[in-house]
C-alpha cells in the first residue's frame, strides 16, 4: 500500500533528575555532597532510508517517544543519557510542523538526517550546588522535560519525468510499456490511486518516470485526492501529457488537455514552466486516427509538440522517448546546492511572559517565565525553595515585584504554594 502523507506525535526524552546524596565512608566524618547529575534525554532524529518508498508504517503507529535520561547517583555518578530515537522515512520526505506549517526539513539525500527535537537536559545533583557558604546543599535539580510536537510528513516522489492526464488516458499502460514497472491497469475512473515509478532505459540513456494518478477538475482545491497527486509533480523536470485522442471515455481531447493544464496552473504556476510534450494516445483505435489531425493542429497552436502513440501496441513510443531524452539533456543542470548531512531544527521559543497579580498583600506569580523556573525545583523542599528564591532574584522577577510595591517579608504565591520572601 502506498501512503504519502502522515501525521505523528513526537517527543524527546526527559532529562534525568539530579540526586541528593552525601559521601558516607568509614573514617570520613563530613564527606560532603556527592549527588550526581541526571542524564540527558534522547533526541528525535529522522533519517532518509533509500530502501523505503512509502509512509505506510506511520498509518499504524502515531506516537514516537525517545528514551528518558536516567537519574544521577551517589558518588558523583552521572545518570546514563537516554538513547536517541531514529525514525526512518523515504528519501524525498518533507517534515512539517503541524501547528505552524513551517517546513522543518526536506530529506532529499539517502541517509540524510534531521535532528528535530533535542532531549531535555539532566538536572544537576547536589554536589554542583556546594559553595563555601553552602557546604551541604540538600536539594538537586529536576531534569528538563523533553520537547514535544505533532509533525506532518509528506512524501514527494523524485522523478525526472511525470506522466499527467485524465483517468484512463493510458498513463499506466505507457509506464508499463516504457519500463519494467507493473502498475495495475483497468478501465475504471481513478484506476491508479497511487503514483508508480519506473526506470526507462532507451538507447543507452536512462531516467525515472512517474505515473501521476489521474486528475480531475477541482484537483487544485484537493478534490478527488488532487493535492495528494499534484504534490508529486513538483519535483519532476518535465511532463508528458497523455491524452486519449480517441475520446473513448466520451470526453473531448482538447478540453481534457486544457482542463489538466488549468489545474496545474491553479495549483502552482511554476508547474506550467516545466517542459511539456503531448502524447496523443490510443492512435491504434479508429476514432483516434480520425481525431488526431484536428487535435494535433490545435495543440501545436498552443506551442506544444504532439506525438501520436499507442501505449498498448507501443506504436510511436520510440519517437516519444527520443524527444524526452533530448529535452532532459537540454535542461540546464541546477547548481547543486550543498545538502547538509545533518539538519538541526531549532523549535521557535515560546514567548516569555510574567504575570503579577496583587491581592491582600499577596503577590501571585504566573506565566511562561515562572513555569520555566519551576520545572527544575521542588517547592516542598526547604533547600530547593531557597534555590528557587535565588532564581527569582537572578532572573529579575524580584525586581519586577518591587515595581509593584513588593517588599521584604511579603508573601509570594506560585501555583497555590505560598511563602514569605526575605532579603
Swiss-Prot record:
Where Mg(2+) is bound, by residue? 172, 192
Outline what the protein does: An essential GTPase which binds GTP, GDP and possibly (p)ppGpp with moderate affinity, with high nucleotide exchange rates and a fairly low GTP hydrolysis rate. Plays a role in control of the cell cycle, stress response, ribosome biogenesis and in those bacteria that undergo differentiation, in morphogenesis control.
Cellular component, GO annotation: cytoplasm
What EC number is given for this enzyme?
3.6.5.-
Q: Which residues does the UniProt record annotate as the domain OBG-type G?
A: 159-329
Gene expressing this chain: obg
Its source organism is Thermoanaerobacter pseudethanolicus (strain ATCC 33223 / 39E)
Question: Which residues hold GTP?
Answer: 165-172, 190-194, 211-214, 281-284, 310-312
* Pfam families in UniProt: DUF1967 (PF09269), GTP1_OBG (PF01018), MMR_HSR1 (PF01926)
- The answer to whether the entry has keyword Hydrolase is yes
What name does UniProt use for this protein? Answer: GTPase Obg
Q: Name one GO biological process term.
A: ribosome biogenesis
Record's SUPFAM superfamilies? Answer: Obg GTP-binding protein C-terminal domain, Obg GTP-binding protein N-terminal domain, P-loop containing nucleoside triphosphate hydrolases
Domain Obg, which positions? Answer: 1-158
